[in-house]
Amino acid sequence: MASVHGTTYELLRRQGIDTVFGNPGSNELPFLKDFPEDFRYILALQEACVVGIADGYAQASRKPAFINLHSAAGTGNAMGALSNAWNSHSPLIVTAGQQTRAMIGVEALLTNVDAANLPRPLVKWSYEPASAAEVPHAMSRAIHMASMAPQGPVYLSVPYDDWDKDADPQSHHLFDRHVSSSVRLNDQDLDILVKALNSASNPAIVLGPDVDAANANADCVMLAERLKAPVWVAPSAPRCPFPTRHPCFRGLMPAGIAAISQLLEGHDVVLVIGAPVFRYHQYDPGQYLKPGTRLISVTCDPLEAARAPMGDAIVADIGAMASALANLVEESSRQLPTAAPEPAKVDQDAGRLHPETVFDTLNDMAPENAIYLNESTSTTAQMWQRLNMRNPGSYYFCAAGGLGFALPAAIGVQLAEPERQVIAVIGDGSANYSISALWTAAQYNIPTIFVIMNNGTYGALRWFAGVLEAENVPGLDVPGIDFRALAKGYGVQALKADNLEQLKGSLQEALSAKGPVLIEVSTVSPVK
């Protein structure tokens, strides 16, 4: 009779999963033993890095990623990264080894007490099988739960003595199961949307990350061009759903209630696609919408639809809805919006570069299809203004604001997109949350470029301290970190740029390299 171990690997294989992202402990060794030759194991040195790498891989590949963590402690280390995955609808299958069944009740060392509850509410589904024979069925359920819209992480705890037990003899029925979450568009909803857009005198469009996840970017461009409507990206955007040099593009929305209502004032119909309404950040009280503005959102997530504080919501397949709207709305006789002017160059300070210059240089030198990961949070506005992001899957950011995402996620994105150059732009404060992911990049020779914006301070916190009128706050500076030394210690080539000439030379060298490169750039803080 087939074992749980062999049956589970065959299930993963038949479902198109051949990569395990992990950091093993003793509870995980029975699962990893006799590791199949047609699988690959991507090791990271800490669990937040494991989940970050897998998250990047899942988002870029648009496929579920399989993760193996160490019991409760490893799961706990991964929770911050899991919050980003939950908010980005990343299809992650997170497994964790559990103590042997005979020892769970006495809570022996490495017991995951109440395992199914540990990762909630950051997972769609969480479970520990009641018996060893049930493990393949639970794994199949996890795969399909993670993959169905809205996608998201799931969690499965497996006692380590289960792997050598006999599987249910009917587990083979699970191997080739296909579960579809396709939903036919509601004609009534479509009719309401099309009529609202056709009759609008001044419509506006707001796009979110699920547009990019659904690869619906081109349809949204067509929709904007037919409506001659301005397009904003929803606040706190973790992906880029629209070309940033398109005439209709108006940039990244602010993250305050009053600021958004002021921005949308005068637009009689606002269509939001693939974004929560809205992911606010700083407290900026005011009207959600000005009088005369009607908002309709299209989302794949019922939770997002239910919690929106205003407007109507339609839960639907993002790709299908974007395509239908693009083909059904009437061509407007309005003039196409005038493209926003490209920002002017910035004068340089001696010994340090302005962030604007770094982004201008990246924009000039990087390949047109480059992929950017951003965790230089104090310079996000400058990045959106200056990078010409043309293609789907060109930008990723921590969806829950949890730092430590970009460095490992860039490695996962590069694994999923080997033909495109991945460039992670990371603040010196952010980089330290997951710096050990550099080791993984070096060991697997993953040719990601890491640009560390070193200004010696938590710039985003300094900005927020001003918003909150919080003076004399300690712990906002992070001096004395040698990122080149850290990179070299993990086996990554490291370069330095204190001026524009050095930056250009370092980028040229990094773009020609066959492995990972870190460039430490001395920058001026945008916040004093």
UniProtKB/Swiss-Prot annotation:
Reactions catalysed according to its record: phenylglyoxylate + H(+) = benzaldehyde + CO2
Highest rank taxon of the organism: Bacteria
GO MF term (any one): acetolactate synthase activity
Calcium listed as a keyword: yes
Pathway terms, separated by semicolons: Aromatic compound metabolism; (R)-mandelate degradation; benzoate from (R)-mandelate: step 3/4
Residue sites binding Ca(2+) per the record: D428, N455, T457
Cofactor binding note of this UniProt entry: Binds 1 Ca(2+) ion per subunit. Binds 1 thiamine pyrophosphate per subunit.
Keywords in alphabetical order: Aromatic hydrocarbons catabolism, Calcium, Decarboxylase, Lyase, Magnesium, Mandelate pathway, Metal-binding, Thiamine pyrophosphate
Repeat in keyword set: no
BP term (GO), one: mandelate catabolic process
This enzyme's EC code(s): 4.1.1.7
Positions of Mg(2+) binding: N117, L118, R120
Family: Belongs to the TPP enzyme family.
NCBIfam families to which the protein is assigned, alphabetical: PRK07092.1 (NF005485)
Name listed for the protein in its UniProt record: Benzoylformate decarboxylase
Protein species of origin: Pseudomonas putida (Arthrobacter siderocapsulatus)
Highest classification ranks of the organism: Bacteria, Pseudomonadati, Pseudomonadota, Gammaproteobacteria, Pseudomonadales
The encoding gene: mdlC
